[in-house]
């Protein structure tokens, strides 16, 4: 009976070792994903600032270079 008990204990130890390796791999994966998400959030925030700047530029360009419809001279055929 003792040999079977050792075999069972060895099987359990192998299972525990496998679970520990899986946990370590998952922890590393979570750390990698967290770092990637942090980098993407930084890039997203930076792009939002750039977009706001460009929208302001476009609005400024449109208002300064385009006359209102009431200010436009009518076409010659009127």
From Swiss-Prot:
Lineage, top-rank taxon, reads Bacteria
Classification via InterPro entries:
SlyX
| Family affiliation | Belongs to the SlyX family.
What name goes with this protein? Answer: Protein SlyX homolog
Organism for this UniProt entry: Photobacterium profundum (strain SS9)
